[in-house]
Structures are given as structure tokens and as C-alpha cells.
Amino acid sequence: MRFQGFWLCLGLLFISVNAEFMDDSVEMEDFDENSEETDELSSEIKYKTPQPVGEVYFTETFDSGRLAGWVLSKAKKDDIDAEISIYDGRWEIEELKENRIPGDRGLVLKSRAKHHAISAVLAKPFIFADKPLVVQYEVNFQDGIDCGGAYIKLLADTDGLNLENFYDKTSYTIMFGPDKCGEDYKLHFIFRHKHPKTGVFEEKHAKPPDVDLKRFFTDRKTHLYTLVMNPDDTFEVLIDQIVVNKGSLLEDVVPPINPPKEIEDPTDEKPDDWDERAKIPDASAVKPEDWDESEPPQIVDSSAVKPDGWLDNEPEFIPDPNAEKPFDWNEDMDGEWEAPHISNPACRIGCGEWSPPMIDNPKYKGIWRPPMIDNPNYQGIWSPRKIPNPDYFEDNHPFLLTSFRALGLELWSMTSDIYFDNFIICSEKEVADRWAADGWGMKILIENANEPSIFKQLMSATEQRPWLWFIYLLTAALPIALIGSFCWPRKVKKKYEDVAFEKLDICKPQTKGALEQEVKEEKAALEKPVDLEEEKKQSDGEIVEKEEEGEPEEKSEEEIEIIEGQEEGNKSNKSGSEDEMKEADESTGSGDGPIKSVRKRRVRKE
């Protein structure tokens, strides 16, 4: 059981490691063709521009190669230098760099470190009423992403909306999509909620997803982002058709939709005599007479002695004798060249002026302070009193947001070649799913077909994780060990199995004179020491002789203990018969007739 449990744990470990490299978020068919077959697959696929099935508010595939209906912004950002305030970032319509499908094009952000703004009007405004909102589009960070976003804005349906003036402060209803800067990976879902009393809009941020978003920014694959808002005030955020975030518009956004009923009174002030001190010095405490505050915390160690070999006149650092002035060193511009300093090899023990080390002063007590006691006048931490919130309201249906009538991308990025494709806004998730299957589904088909084999993925994984070689070797040995354990199981002998219980040897009849002679010889042997080698040979000879007479096999210590236990049991059961044998011996002991004696066979122990 221990053997099988070990390999079971090893198998589970390998599965957990392998899961790190497998995309378990998307359930797609595995393709195991080689590179030639995948090239043929890409050329054989007949791409067809997706067509919406059902009511839609906006669709865009960019397959026509033209930006028909899209408006480039001519606005300028406020509060920044004029040189960088212009939205002069470049957009192009191109196919994907990798895993391209002939005829499938997308909108590509082409400029680095520039502001980009482009927008398009919906076929009809979306009004939040009794139908869900479904927003979906594709993003591919073809060169990865250092710092930048790929989110969209749904621009509010206002009278002053002008797409040529679209900039960062243009009023929007929803902001949705991926964003990254540094190591902060985000998937925004922000909506602007209107205060019913003051009319002021406030941004509400959905809680962050519970999944690691890093791979969606770094794997250079096309990913599908979907937002679903329902009339029951719930929402879902999906990546590649997998829900990564969901919740309630009333409970899972920050700040909350409804303000608190009571707020702190801004006019309330803390009284001057309010005592917030929980502890105060004990006024009745007196400093001890022997308390010396003049002693320093550390003193010179008077017992320290300068180590032998300490060089007082040697510098601790010296110029590097092996250093050479760079060939391009210009003394007029760079100044006089000096060799870098290195540790003085002669200062192995120490160099420079020696001074004894400092140690803690055992007499140090520091400045005396009275002990702290509970404050009898403690009133607690003061806080302003609560008053009814004059701006309080209760909105139990936050889904009813401001309608929108345009979609825009207002982005700044330090990385170029961000690919956008297949925008759709509708009210039915099934319509968006069909749209995704005809567009994004084709891209995933090609990407999976061009994926390297499992073997190549495992080998490439070891470049960053060398410890995986150990897992691979153990995993390779797993089936061999299991087959061996089942085909050639280890034979385990049962305890006491094949133990032969043999009868005690009964010596040949001996005369009384012969017994007396043996007794004399034993006494003589005890009185005269015998050479160890002769004794060993004699004992070996006796054992060999007895083995020839009786049993040819030797018995283990456990078998001897069993035999002795049975002999002791037999003694108690056969006490009557032994008494009779003794009486028979005594009756024949007066003469030289033969007698019988029972002996226990000596067994050599190895």
C-alpha cells in the first residue's frame, strides 16, 4: 500500500504541474498535426465574414479593409503639453501577424507612446429598459504589452456628442476591457451612475476578477471579451466564453450605488477638554535614588586586544593594479582617469588605526520615566456625531443607466500592434455566441493547430523551470515501476511458514561407565584452557557430525525459539512419562547396562 500510495502522489503532482501549462479555461479540440499539416489547414480554411443572426445595435469585422463609419478624433487632451496632447496615433486595418486567416482583418493600433482615439456610431442607441446588454469584441496583444490598454467606451447619448471631439473627458456610460501597466493586470468594468438628487455622475467599479489575468496579456493569442448586463441588476464578465467575474450591481461595485443613510456631521468639533489618552504617567511614582542617567548605553571593551597581524599603516582599499583605462576615455570630457579601488589583499586581518570595539554598558539604565497607568478620565476616541445624509437616496434598479449611441477606443500605449476585431453589441447572448463561433472560433482553430506538440511544450517549460526534469524522469519511471510491481510481485513468506518441527534426537544406548568418563573429560576441559582456534574447530566438528547424523538444514533463531517453546510444553505434558524413565534408569544404574538419555540438539547460529 505504501508503494502504490507513493506513485499515486507522484502522479497527482505531475498532473498539477502539467495543468500550469495547459489552457483549462477554454474547452477546445486538441490538434496534433505537424507544422506542414497546419499550414495546409490554414490554406484550406475558407473564411467567411461573420453575419449577425438576430437584432444587433452594432457590428464591425473590418474585413472590407476600410474604416467606413469610423471617425478619427481631432481633439486635444487638456492640462498637458501641446506636443503630446494631440490624438495623432495611427490606426491600420491588417491581418494578424501570426496564425493569419486569408480575408480576416482587424483594426490595429500602430503607434507607440501616442494618444489614439477612434469611434463609430451605433445603428441605433441602446436604451436600458427590459432587455439585457451584451458587448463583445476580440483583442490580440501581438507584441505583448508593456503599458497600455485595449478597453472600449460606450459613449453616452447626449446632445453635444461629436465624434471628432472624442477625448478622455467625453461622457461615457460604460468602460470595459483589458488594461495593463507594470505588473498590474486589469479587466475594467466601469459604469457611470447618475445621482438622482444632484444629477452628478459617479464612476462605479466592479470588483476585480478572481483569476490570474497575466496570460491573456502575454500569450499573444486572440482572446474574446464579453460583458453581459441583465435587467435584474446582475452582470457577468467572460473571457473566451468562460465567466471570470459576476455579481450584483447593487452589492459588488465600489463605491456602492446607494449612499449611507447617516453621515458624520461636518460642523461637529471635538471639545477642548476631551481626553483620548488611555494611559497616563503615574504622578505618584518617584525615581529611585540609585538611578544613574549619566551612564552611556555602550562602553569601550577594556579587555579587547589588537589582533596579531593588524596593519596600522595599510589602507583598506587600493587601486586595482589590473585595471586599464578604457580606449575611448577622453580626459577633456571625462576627467582624469582613476583605476577602480578593490579590497587590499594585505588586510586579511585588518588595516588602519585599530580601536577597541564597543560593548553594552551593564550599568546603563537610561532616562527614568514614571510607569504608565490607566487614565481615570479616559473618554475614548472622539468621533463626530451622526446626522441624516441630506443626499441619501435609494436606487434599487441601477441597471437603468444613461443610454449610449457610440462606441469608441481612446487609448495610450507603449506597445504597438494591438489587434481589435469583431465588435458586436446586442441583447441576446445566443446572438453573440453565434457571432463568436464564426469569427473568434476560426482564429482559435488555427492557433490550436499551430500550437507546438506536447513534447515541445514540456521541453520549453524546462528552460524556465529546470526542476521539471526531475518530475519528467519520475513520471517516465512510473509506468515501468507499476508494470513491474504487477507482473513480478514480491514474494512474502508468511511467518512460521515452512517451519519444520522435528522430533528430538534420542541418543544411542550408553553404559554407566561411558557416562562417568564423559563427566571426567568435561571437568578436565574446564580446568585446562583450550586454544580458541581448537575450540572453534572442535565445535564446528561436532556440529558437522551432528548435522550428518540428523538434519541437513539449519534453523533460524525464530525456529529455535518455537522448538524450545514446544519442548517446554511437552515437558509439562510428559512429566509422568519422564518420571517413569528416571525410575527405569535408577533400576539399571547399579550395573553397566545400557541407559537412554534425552538431549537437545545443538544448532549453530549464524
Curated annotation (Swiss-Prot):
Disulfide bonds join 147-181, 347-351. One of its GO terms (biological process) is ERAD pathway. PROSITE patterns: CALRETICULIN_1 (PS00803), CALRETICULIN_2 (PS00804), CALRETICULIN_REPEAT (PS00805). Keywords: Acetylation, Calcium, Chaperone, Disulfide bond, Endoplasmic reticulum, Membrane, Phosphoprotein, Repeat, Signal, Transmembrane, Transmembrane helix. GO terms for molecular function: calcium ion binding; protein folding chaperone; unfolded protein binding. Belongs to the calreticulin family. This is Calmegin. It comes from Bos taurus (Bovine).
